[in-house]
A protein has these predicted regions:
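Sec/Tat signal peptide C-region and signal peptidase I cleavage site
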Residues: 38-44
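Charged/polar low-complexity intrinsically disordered segments
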Residues: 10, 20-22
Length: 276
């Protein structure tokens, strides 16, 4: 009996040791699995990357605050001209939702398979003539643009920015384009166009009404709204992108739906957009 006891003790120690090793391996494996999955899950559910046209910058910053407060989903905004953003999306940029300044670019992305559905109008933009030059006050008939005192007129590049298209249409509507085309300086986006005017690199220029109504712009310069019959209505559309559906469907869908909510529409209206 005395000889048997050490043997039993050794067997028990061996079993316990092997059990502990197996448990450690399982714990390590679970830690690796959950450590790898958790960031992906959190990112998919808690962050949405939204490409926005530059005219939407100020309105979307306010919308972002309200959306994050209501849903707990973080919003990352990527701002540029609609044309440039569209090109980035076509080249594989990892954006979830595209909020354009027109319907053409999002429709083109849908036609090429980069968006999950046809674009839907979320707002209609309005064009203004704005200056930050002291003593200069824009007039609705635009004839003052012919003055020798005005040497540079800023517009967004019509090749990539819908508000640039509207600006050129306006000048042609008033039969001023040919006489003013040598004065035109082009911003890459409506945001850069605003910078040209704000820094007085241009004397005056065409930007979005949403920009001059932003709190950051209060009291800066003078502006006049361009009559809506002078240019094609700026119908602004949004789409969920294929990347958003494939990798972040819940967050992308939630943000897209919010754009058309009463809360979002009131924000757009506050910034001078025409809404339903």
């Amino acid at each position: 009996m005395l000889n048997a006891t050490p043997c039993l003790f050794e067997i028990n120690v061996d079993l316990v040791g092997r059990y502990k090793k197996k448990m450690k391996k399982c714990a390590l494996l679970l830690a690796i699995i959950f450590g790898w999955l958790q960031p992906l899950t959190v990112h998919a559910q808690k962050t949405v990357t939204v490409a926005i046209a530059a005219n939407m910058q100020f309105a979307m910053e306010q919308l972002k605050v309200e959306f994050e407060k209501e849903t707990g989903i973080k919003v990352e905004l990527i701002t540029s001209s609609s044309g440039k953003l569209s090109a980035q999306i076509a080249e594989g940029a990892p954006y979830d939702v595209f909020v354009s300044a027109d319907m053409k670019y999002p429709q083109d992305l849908y036609d090429k398979g980069f968006a999950t559905g046809t674009p839907k109008v979320y707002a209609i933009g309005q064009l203004v003539l704005w200056t930050s030059k002291p003593g200069l006050k824009p007039t609705a008939d635009l004839k003052q643009l012919l003055s020798a005192a005005i040497k540079k007129i800023a517009v967004a590049n019509p090749k990539t920015a819908p508000y640039g298209v509207a600006a050129e249409e306006t000048l042609k509507y008033y039969k001023l384009y040919d006489g003013l085309k040598d004065k035109l300086v082009y911003g890459e986006s409506i945001g850069q166009t605003q910078q040209f005017i704000e820094t007085q690199a241009a004397d005056i220029g065409f930007i979005a009404k949403s920009q001059v109504l932003a709190a950051e712009m209060k009291g800066r310069g003078a502006w006049v709204e361009i009559p809506g019959n002078a240019y094609t209505p700026i119908r602004q559309g949004a789409v969920i992108l294929k990347h958003g559906k494939d990798t972040n469907n819940a967050a992308a869908g939630t943000f897209y739906a919010y754009i058309f909510s009463d809360a979002a529409q009131q924000i757009f209206k506050k910034f001078g957009y025409i809404v339903n």
